[in-house]
């Protein structure tokens, strides 16, 4: 297991008395904004992402256990980005080979440029009070757009929509257009698995070829889940340096 002591963002979510477990959902007052999606107010909504992609070394995987499920909704979804890559045209595979993508740590949807539901609107503090957590200011990180699994050699599409910034070396308009296309392609239901939780369910996944999302649940409901991060990293990235990447 990867110790939370090694990562500020994980350490801030640690389960009391544990250095290995984090609590990814809570009861009571949320620690992040809630959102209206299709007119329904939902807490706990976390957009599609790859864990620790905001660091140079992407973790091997994670293990998630549902301690107390909510009464309605609260599903978690996964997308197999190796399957996404396999579905690309040969022309697209050739085009994106060698491209690098800049990622940023985001814990809210502020600044997310691609793929958010059209109906999404952030609820105000008056509509859905929350206690904001302190987010560390970390440098952006660069990873390949085509990721290669360190054990199998299989390629996957390195798309983590929550933290995407741009593609290095491309004009902004071209970068935005390509990322918008690739995010829309990735978020097709045919690539998704949506899990309907029961208490004590456990799901493990290979983080090096997946992205996942918490689909939210009604504001005011309780949902508690614990996660352990699996050690064994994919050292595919580096910190972004503006002058070096100009």
Predicted features and spans:
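Fe(II)/2-oxoglutarate oxygenase catalytic core
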Residues: 1-204, 208-246
């Amino acid at each position: 297991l990867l110790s939370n002591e090694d990562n500020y963002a994980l350490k801030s979510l640690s389960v009391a008395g544990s250095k290995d477990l984090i609590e990814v959902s809570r009861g009571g007052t949320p620690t992040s904004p809630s959102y209206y999606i299709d007119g329904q107010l939902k807490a706990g909504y976390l957009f599609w992402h790859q864990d620790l992609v905001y660091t140079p070394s992407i973790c091997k995987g994670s293990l998630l256990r549902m301690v107390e499920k909510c009464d309605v909704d609260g599903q978690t979804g996964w997308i197999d980005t190796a399957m996404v890559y396999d579905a690309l045209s040969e022309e697209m595979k050739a085009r994106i080979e060698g491209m690098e993508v800049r990622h940023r740590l985001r814990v809210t949807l502020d600044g997310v440029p691609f793929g958010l539901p059209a109906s999404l609107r952030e609820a105000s503090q008056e509509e859905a009070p929350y206690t904001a957590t302190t987010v560390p200011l970390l440098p952006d990180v660069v990873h390949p757009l085509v990721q290669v699994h360190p054990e199998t050699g299989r390629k996957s599409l390195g798309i983590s929509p929550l933290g995407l910034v741009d593609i290095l070396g491309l004009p902004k308009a071209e970068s935005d257009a390509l990322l918008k296309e690739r995010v829309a392609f990735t978020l097709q239901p045919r690539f998704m698995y949506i899990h309907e939780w029961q208490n004590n369910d456990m799901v493990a996944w290979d983080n090096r070829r997946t992205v996942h999302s918490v689909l939210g649940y009604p504001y005011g409901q309780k949902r508690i889940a614990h996660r352990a991060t699996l050690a064994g990293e994919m050292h595919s990235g580096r910190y972004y340096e503006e002058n070096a990447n100009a």
